[in-house]
């Protein structure tokens, strides 16, 4: 049975301090990277306890790298294997798009890889197209067969690859593949996210030679083999950002422990425009929300622009800001589904293709809503904090993919929030 979250809002001013987990978007490719080691152990610390991490652990374990996860210590030990399997089967890959990043490591080590189509997306769709074209440029032959993508190359060769779009997944997959290739690979128009830097840091500790991560040109010199290493997962900037918005919306005063302001520049800049105060302290970043937020215009872009993963949460802040706000989503299609649910709480919004015009409304009323995706579920809970009366958020399986104990952290900051079994809901 699924759970639901019940928030009683309208009065809450969040106060206190909050600890942020390791980044989900970093740890999944780090787990894929463990497949590249043919000797030793890769030890990952600061690992977030999330359903996506369990799924990736199962996949990597199935492929031949033995995984043990000590949840109390937030530590994963990945024991390398002199041989790994070539096929990533449907039951592991279908549940999680990010699992496509095992293709690069398998191909690099085995000269061939068979990976089930992730979440049933067709090859022509943009996200995976870039990965495959990159593999082809490195000398692989790609075929599609019975729901599987197959790549074959006796030995991958270094190549000069230009990405049409700075896709995070493609950048990660191609870096992973290039680590063991013959010669040097140059990736141009590469994604620049902090999670890419984190991946390169681990790979270099494992014996790879990756330079330029965090810029749009990444150069990878292939090495003979890779080994174990120790690495602490970078902090989750999206979780940190979500708590920044929560403090901003509730006239709160919240210290985000060890926050890396550098990773959240665009968000901090936009929230500052809305009247939020940020104070850098020794132990983290203090976020102080104003009496009333001011409206603002936001456009999502690849890093270092405003992150699409903060778009839903930001629309929740815009919903209670004074005046008309604009949100333009340029990174993903179809990422406004949560706005229809927010309307039930009283959001006033006009949507034209990828642009939402939001009229701020300080008179929101709690309602029953269901989350449409991971970030939307957090955004609906944030809106519930400021809406008068009771908001019930269902379908929490989305939330658990990317937030650990989200309701408990909010409760510790003073929110009136509980999570209970959903007797009559659909999960």
Curated annotation (Swiss-Prot):
Q: Where does phosphoenolpyruvate bind?
A: 24-25
Pathway-wise, it operates in:
Cell wall biogenesis; peptidoglycan biosynthesis
- Record-annotated active site: 121
Q: Which residues carry this modification: 2-(S-cysteinyl)pyruvic acid O-phosphothioketal?
A: 121
Q: Which GO terms describe its biological process?
A: cell division; cell wall organization; peptidoglycan biosynthetic process; regulation of cell shape; UDP-N-acetylgalactosamine biosynthetic process
What chemistry does it catalyse, as a reaction equation?
Answer: phosphoenolpyruvate + UDP-N-acetyl-alpha-D-glucosamine = UDP-N-acetyl-3-O-(1-carboxyvinyl)-alpha-D-glucosamine + phosphate
Q: What does this protein do?
A: Cell wall formation. Adds enolpyruvyl to UDP-N-acetylglucosamine.
A GO CC annotation recorded here is: cytoplasm
The protein's GO terms of the molecular function aspect are: UDP-N-acetylglucosamine 1-carboxyvinyltransferase activity
EC numbers listed for it are 2.5.1.7
Q: Which InterPro entries match?
A: Enolpyruvate_Tfrase_dom, Enolpyruvate_Tfrase_sf, MurA_subfamily, RNA3'P_cycl/enolpyr_Trfase_a/b, UDP_GlcNAc_COvinyl_MurA
Q: Where does UDP-N-acetyl-alpha-D-glucosamine bind?
A: 97, 126-130, 309, 331
Extract the PANTHER family matched here. UDP-N-ACETYLGLUCOSAMINE 1-CARBOXYVINYLTRANSFERASE (PTHR43783:SF1)
Q: Which organism is it from?
A: Lactococcus lactis subsp. lactis (strain IL1403) (Streptococcus lactis)
Query: Top enzyme class of this protein?
Result: transferase
Question: Could you identify this protein by its name?
Answer: UDP-N-acetylglucosamine 1-carboxyvinyltransferase 1
Q: What is its main location?
A: cytoplasm
